[in-house]
Amino acid sequence: MPWAALLAGMHATVSPSRVRGRARAPPSKSYTHRALLAAGYADGETVVRDPLVSADTRATARAVELLGGAAARENGDWVVTGFGSRPAIPDAVIDCANSGTTMRLVTAAAALADGTTVLTGDESLRARPHGPLLDALSGLGGTARSTRGNGQAPLVVDGPVSGGSVALPGDVSSQFVTALLMAGAVTETGIETDLTTELKSAPYVDITLDVLDAFGVGASETAAGYRVRGGQAYAPSGAEYAVPGDFSSASYLLAAGALAAADGAAVVVEGMHPSAQGDAAIVDVLERMGADIDWDTESGVITVQRSELSGVEVGVADTPDLLPTIAVLGAAADGTTRITDAEHVRYKETDRVAAMAESLSKLGASVEERPDELVVRGGDTELSGASVDGRGDHRLVMALAVAGLVADGETTIAGSEHVDVSFPDFFEVLAGLGADTDG
């Protein structure tokens, strides 16, 4: 079946398969978002090299344009003309589609404009929380509100903010901190954030600091949160920035190799150089489970072979995007896998804790859902093919496709088109490794 037809049908069928070969993980979605907006904050032209071009990152590029910049695709790169320290007042509503990162980061950028900006998104995004960011921007001198009064989009933002100090929780989304740091660098006085609760997904703020540094912007962690000086200029060396590979996306390929590599063969994933990404922890998780895996950090190549896996306990406070992958690994491993610190994973594109519990149960796994945990008892039952729903969540779709490689019979996943959010050619790459995904 042609790939276009497969995706147009909004479902994918995966049958038991053995995989082998080399693949390249897509560029990092997190880095691409930040690089596009950082280039927007810059004056003049910046080339963002090797970006991820997906539904989510296209939403950020469109937002940069509506704020007065330009973003053109040239030879696989994104050439961005910045709007500088003062975005324009958009002449249309900014539609962030399904991208929470776009909405959070651009909401703070919009608060720099001398006027009103309206942001919205699809049904899933309109159900996600933004209240702490709205309160923070209002506390910094702007006006930011939810039209429904519940902290959810549509959002209306009035600026400009000039900077200051603000308190906000750290356990809802680290993207609030990222948004304030990126915008704060071009305010008059800078922005200091004091976190009132423990920061979840802290490595994503590390990614932000990494990108800011590459663009010549200084920001730092404090005893209570983070601080960025005002009056800074975004100016990357050589007016360009190269995006690293994405460990979140690579996790599905690595899991496929650990569970379904052919005898005597391996799955080799290229483009995986060390970076600030917390999801590089997937390598450690696989090692702890007993996988035969090797990471050559100098060449950026990870090699994994099939082996017997054992259950482990893994906290995902800093790596929420890995929960679906780890849950699938646990379902195919011996013993119990306990995924902890997972309450915030319920507030992604969907409630990933509940969704994975439901889907893995349909496939025959023994799963227990708790408020802050997902417990998967591997080895209790054999996985069997079934029809499961990706719930409009790209990470669920890809994780369940990996489960389909080792389930008995066909696994049909609804909503397969949503891989376009972060890994548009996922099914083509999986087929290139030998997976039977043509139904």
UniProtKB/Swiss-Prot annotation:
It holds the Pfam family EPSP_synthase. Pathway: Metabolic intermediate biosynthesis; chorismate biosynthesis. Keywords: Amino-acid biosynthesis, Aromatic amino acid biosynthesis, Cytoplasm, Transferase. Disulfide bonds: none annotated. This is 3-phosphoshikimate 1-carboxyvinyltransferase. 3-phosphoshikimate binds at K29, S30, R34, S173, S174, Q175, S201, D321, K348. It comes from Halobacterium salinarum (strain ATCC 700922 / JCM 11081 / NRC-1) (Halobacterium halobium). NCBIfam families: aroA (TIGR01356). The active site is at D321 (proton acceptor). GO terms for molecular function: 3-phosphoshikimate 1-carboxyvinyltransferase activity.
